[in-house]
Regions:
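Short glycine/acidic-rich loop motifs that flank beta-strands on beta-rich extracellular proteins
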Residues: 1, 20-26, 53-60, 81-87, ...
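Surface-exposed loop/turn motifs in large extracellular/passenger domains
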Residues: 2-12, 29-46, 63-73, 90-102, ...
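Active/binding-pocket-proximal capping segment
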Residues: 180-183, 188-193, 205, 262
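Acidic, glycine- and Ser/Thr-rich low-complexity intrinsically disordered tracts
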Residues: 205-316
């Protein structure tokens, strides 16, 4: 645990396994009120955290609460019953100390095991300007009843950049935003969400929830977008364009709203202003069967400006 007043701490090259609870805890649950309480400039790098939560099942691999300038990079986190990496600890739009945190280059897999609900490979909470979730490989996220998501931006998550990630084989979706504002989701690969692929649970009238651009979404019969308990896409509260969508079944469902029961055709979706420059086409992965999501040079996504930011698609 890296607690109150800690600065300049680095945890590197450790193996943490067979854990009753979580792996590494950074920061506190409360917003610091004095200089000596602040937790900042921490690095958690190149560690292996596995087989956790054996007593307290809801434990997290790396938990970052009210802390800033924290780097969680190049770790492998696996075989937990709950979230892999959690960042921020303010519910909704209230005061938050968490900002400028980087979650990059981690391999997070075999999370949830179908035991608990409402989790993510990477989970964020609250307003976090400057925070980025970048170039992570996340796969095999499985929830009990609901909420097995790859990247999960929970209540109030705002001003966060999610880019260059490869997320696949989740029970409920590669990306989920509960509610938040002005998040940027770009240059990611989201593949093979069982129930849905991209989920927004609660939109807000007159607020841009997220900008979704230059992503590749591969489905196998589930809708590309899903609206949750209080999201109506007719509110026009997201910006989505220059994406590539493909369904292995040949029957693409662009969007389904749980609140209204409505399904949108591509033409109806575009009539709302969404995805007018996006295309429905095979993204040309190296091998979906082998879960190698490396793009061939002839991929249509590259023509739309998709950026291969990282070593996309390989487990490493």
């Amino acid at each position: 645990e890296i607690g109150e007043g800690c600065r300049g701490v680095r945890v590197e090259g450790c193996r943490l396994y067979d854990l009753g609870a979580g792996g590494i805890k950074v920061g506190t649950q409360h917003v610091p009120r004095s200089e000596w309480e602040k937790v900042e400039f921490i690095e958690v790098a190149s560690n292996r955290i596995e087989r956790g939560g054996r007593v307290f099942h809801s434990a997290v691999g790396v938990w970052v609460g009210q802390a800033r300038f924290v780097r969680v990079v190049a770790n492998e986190i696996a075989d937990l019953f709950y979230t892999g990496v959690s960042v921020g600890w303010t519910w909704g739009y209230g005061e938050s100390f968490a900002c400028c945190n980087l979650i990059e280059g981690n391999v997070i897999h075999d999370i949830g095991a179908g035991l608990l609900s409402d989790m993510g490979g990477v989970y964020t909470l609250g307003v976090q300007p400057g925070t980025a979730v970048r170039c992570n490989i996340i796969y095999n996220v499985s929830a009990y009843q609901y909420g097995g998501w790859g990247v999960y931006l929970d209540e109030g998550s705002s001003y966060i950049v999610v880019e260059g990630n490869v997320v696949y084989d989740t029970t409920h979706g590669g990306f989920h935003q509960h509610y938040g504002r002005w998040n940027i989701v770009r240059d990611n690969i989201f593949a093979l969400g069982r129930e849905a692929n991209i989920v927004l649970s609660r939109g807000e009238e007159g607020q841009v929830a997220l900008i979704f651009e230059r992503n590749i979404v591969l489905s196998n019969g589930s809708p590309i977008f899903q609206g949750g308990y209080a999201q109506r896409y007719s509110m026009r509260n997201i910006v989505s364009d220059r994406n590539v969508y493909w369904d292995l079944t040949g029957r693409l469902t662009v969007c389904r709203e749980q609140a209204t029961g409505r399904e949108y055709t591509l033409d109806e979706w575009r009539a709302l202003g969404y995805d007018r420059l996006s295309i429905v086409d095979d993204p040309l992965f190296a091998s979906v069967e082998l879960r190698d999501f490396t793009l061939r040079d002839s991929s249509p996504a590259l023509r739309l400006g998709f950026r291969r930011l990282c070593r996309n698609g390989q487990k490493g």
